[in-house]
C-alpha cells in the first residue's frame, strides 16, 4: 500500500502540473480579448481586438456576446487566420436564422505590424505603373512619407546599375591592336589609349594589323597601307597635300598701273578704226602780251584762232600740247580738226586735212610774219616731226 501510494504521488503531481498549465493558458487566451459592450438594441459595440483589428458592429449585442463566449474555441483559431478568414468566422458564429445577430463591419484598422509591408508593396506597384496614389486617409501618411519610401526603393536599383557599369569599364583594359603586341595601355598617354596603339608602333614604318601590313598616320590617327606614305614621312600623302595647300599663301595678281609704266608727259592714246589718238610733244614758243587776233582763214583751208594769253614777251615755256582727232578713210586721213593747247597761254584751233602738214607749218610761219607788223613775235624753236599714216605696232 505504501509503495503504491508513494508511487502514485509522482504521477498525481505530474497530472496536476499539466492540468494547471492548460488552465493558465486558457485564462491567458481569455484575458487577451477585451470585451466592451453595452446592452440594448441600436447601440454600437466594439468587437474584441484580434491582432490589432477593431471591428464595429451594430444590432443586438447581448446575443452576439453569448454566441461568442460559447464558441471561445473558435476565437482562438481566428488569431492564426487572415483578415478575410476572420471576417467569415465571425459571421458564421451567429445562427443563420437569427436576424438580430447580423453584424455590419463599418471600419477596419490594421495594426502597425502589417502597415509597413503593405505600404512598400503599394508604392512599388505605383512606381511600376507610373502612377501616384494618395492613400493618406487609409494609411494615415502624408506625401513626404510616400516620397521617402519611393526614394528608398529607387536608390538600390540606381546603385546597382552604376556598379555594373563601373565593373564593365574596369574589365575593358586598353591594349595595343598590333598583332603580337597586346601591350597594356592603362599607364600610357590618352592619345595612345584612344587609338589603341603603343608609342613604339605608332612610329614604326611597317606594322601588321589583322594580318595586313599597315602604317599609322599621325595626322589621320588611323592605319593606312604602306603605299600611301612617302619615305621618311609619318603622315599619308593625301593628308600632307591638303596640309601644304593650306599653308601656301595664294599669289595675288597685281593690276597694271599706267601711271607707273608711262610718263604723264608722254602719254599717248590713239583711235585706230574708232580709237582716239592723243600725242604730247614738247615745244618752245615765245608769246607776247599785247596782241588780240581774230580767226584767220588760210588759203590751204586751215582756220587758226588764238586766245589772248597772260605772259611776258620772249618768255620761254614748255608743255604745249598738240592733239589730233582723225578718222581713217580709203584715201588716207580725211579732213579733221586739230587743237593746239598751250598751258596758261591759250588754245589754237585749226581745221583741214592732215595730209597738208607742210602747209600747216608754213601757215604758222606766215602767221608769225603777219604778227610782226602788229608787234607780236611768234618764234617756234622746235617743230614736231610730221605725222604720217604709219604707227608703231605697240599702239594698236
Swiss-Prot record:
Stretch list, region Disordered: 74-104
Q: Please give the coiled-coil regions recorded for this protein.
A: none
**Any one GO MF annotation of this record:** DNA-binding transcription factor activity
Has keyword Metal-binding? yes
Cofactor binding: number and manner: Binds 2 Zn(2+) ions per subunit.
Cellular component aspect of the GO annotation:
nucleus
> Residues that bind Zn(2+) 2, according to the entry?
217, 220, 224, 236
Q: Where is this protein chiefly located?
A: nucleus
| SBP-type ZnF | 173-250
Residue intervals passing through the bilayer: none
Q: What InterPro entries has UniProt attached to this entry?
A: SBP-like, SBP_dom, SBP_sf
Cofactor requirement: Zn(2+)
Task: Establish whether keyword Nucleus is in the entry.
Answer: yes
Spell out the subcellular localization from the entry: Nucleus
Function of the molecule: Trans-acting factor that binds specifically to the consensus nucleotide sequence 5'-TNCGTACAA-3'.
Which PANTHER family is this protein grouped with? SQUAMOSA PROMOTER-BINDING-LIKE PROTEIN 10 (PTHR31251:SF95), SQUAMOSA PROMOTER-BINDING-LIKE PROTEIN 4 (PTHR31251)
Quote the protein name from its UniProt record: Squamosa promoter-binding-like protein 10
Protein species of origin: Arabidopsis thaliana
Q: Which gene encodes it?
A: SPL10
